[in-house]
Every structure is written in C-alpha cells, then in structure tokens.
C-alpha cells in the first residue's frame, strides 16, 4: 500500500496493470485498501494478447465492473492489424508482442508509471530489478541504470518521455500470494483450481487445447485433472497436474514446490537463458 501511495503521489499519470491473474488480483485488493473509500487515482489496464483463457477475461471484466473503475485494453491484435508487429502464426506465441502494445498505450495516454504484479522469485531477471524500475524514453530497461533503493526511500522522478515500472509485490513469494488470497478471500479465475481439461503434452508441458492450440499429427489431446499456477497467453502457458480445489490445498502444494510458477509452466521463458531479461530490455513488464 505504501508503494502504491508513493507512486500515486510522485507520478503524474500512473496506471495499474491487471491481467486477471492471481498477482494482479492481489494488487487490486491492496489498491482498495490504499485508496478506498475514494476511487483509484489511476485507471486499470490490461495488455490483451487476444489468446487469453476465456475464464480470465470474464473474471477481468466482472472484477473491474464490481470496483466501478476505468478499464483500458491495449490490444496486441490491434498492433498486428496496424502493422506494428507481425503475427507469429498459428503456433507462435503473442506474449512477446505485448511489449509493443504496452509501450504504444503508455505513449498514447501519457503514463509515467505502470504498476505491475511481478515478483522477484519468479525469474532471475526480475530478481535483480528494483521496486521502482526506471525505463528510458524508449521504454527499455537497463540494469546498470537502476537507482539505489535504501530502506523505503524511492525516487519516482522521471524526465518527459521516461517512465517507471512499479512492483509493490517484488519481495512476495508465490506462497505469500496464496496465503494472502486465503486470508482476504480474494476471488480468482476458476482455472487456478483443479478441474478437468483437455490438454496436449508438448515440450514437457501440458498445454490446454483451445482455438489456438491444437494437436499436431504426432500428438493427441487427453483429459486430465489440472490447474494453472500462472495465467498468460494460452499458447505458452502450461497446466500442472493437481487435485487442489481449495486455497488451503494449493498452499500445501506450493509449500512443497521447488520450481517457480514461470519456470515450470511458461514456454516463453524457455527460448533462452536470458529470455525475460531480453524482453525487459525491449520494454516488457
């Protein structure tokens, strides 16, 4: 809450990024605690790949409507239609294309700070990122240009065209997130809990069969009891085998896990050892 208030106080036009996932659902609850009974001092924005799980989009729209806040949607499909980026094709992921849609929206609306739900335990690139992460006029992240953060002293000063990414959940872990969800009774999309789903095993991951993910000639779809540890583009987000249908059961699973949710279930992080850092240098979340 302190970090959100700090960003709202120091920055002229911040925005809260909301994907409909568990981390951004926690961010919304923290924003409620920080600013209610007034309205949020920033709009809510989703960078939509167009390949999202329907349950997540339904939850996104319902949750924002319940809050009575403004929702902006930065569309990857629009970036493709206008020639800003190339369509990766039927088997490609649009996850990396979110960078262009995000930066275009930041420029369009004049945002100087974007509040996101990234955590340091997710990936080694995020582990070395500041709570207030400085981005240059091109939206790019340079680890060598990050500002020192001593105690709870944060600098939100930027020049015109520059911006910040703010990560209030930086020091939280996946276990912290789920414990907070349980304590606060935070609603989540149903795909976070165990359910029957048709999946395809590909490259060691269980991808949900969908309009964008179909079995290849040497593959077959099978119905399994699974849940998702993280949500993203359906073409690169894998499920895990699970029987956990309650928050308490998920907490027990997470406590035994030794691999982060991104490391275990995100194909877009497997392109190279520096996949996340490369994307951040381009302007990713």
Protein language model features and the residues they cover:
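Nucleotide-activated chemistry modules centered on ATP-dependent adenylation/adenylyltransferase
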Residues: 1-285
């Amino acid at each position: 809450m302190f970090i959100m208030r700090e960003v709202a106080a120091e920055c002229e036009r911040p925005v809260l990024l909301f994907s409909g996932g568990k981390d951004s659902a926690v961010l919304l609850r923290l924003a409620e605690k920080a600013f209610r009974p007034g309205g949020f001092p920033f709009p809510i924005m989703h960078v939509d790949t167009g390949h999202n799980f329907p349950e997540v989009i339904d939850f996104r729209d319902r949750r924002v409507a319940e809050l009575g806040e403004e929702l902006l949607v930065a569309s990857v499909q629009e970036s493709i239609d206008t020639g800003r980026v190339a369509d990766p094709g039927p088997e490609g992921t649009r996850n990396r294309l979110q960078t262009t849609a995000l930066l275009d929206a930041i420029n369009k609306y004049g945002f100087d700070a974007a509040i996101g739900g990234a955590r340091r335990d997710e990936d080694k690139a995020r582990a070395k990122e500041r709570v207030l992460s400085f981005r240059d006029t091109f939206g790019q992240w340079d680890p060598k240009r990050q500002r020192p953060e001593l105690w709870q002293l944060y600098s939100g000063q930027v020049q015109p065209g520059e911006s910040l990414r703010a990560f209030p959940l930086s020091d939280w872990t996946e276990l912290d997130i789920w414990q907070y969800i349980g304590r606060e009774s935070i609603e989540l999309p149903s795909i976070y809990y165990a359910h029957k789903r048709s999946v395809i095993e590909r490259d060691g991951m269980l991808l949900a069969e969908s309009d964008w993910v179909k079995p290849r000639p040497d593959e077959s779809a099978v119905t399994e009891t699974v849940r998702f540890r993280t949500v993203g583009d359906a073409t690169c987000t894998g499920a895990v085998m699970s029987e956990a249908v309650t928050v308490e059961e998920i907490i027990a699973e997470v406590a035994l896990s030794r691999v982060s949710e991104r490391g275990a279930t995100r194909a877009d992080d497997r392109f190279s050892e520096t996949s996340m850092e490369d994307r951040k240098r381009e302007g990713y979340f």
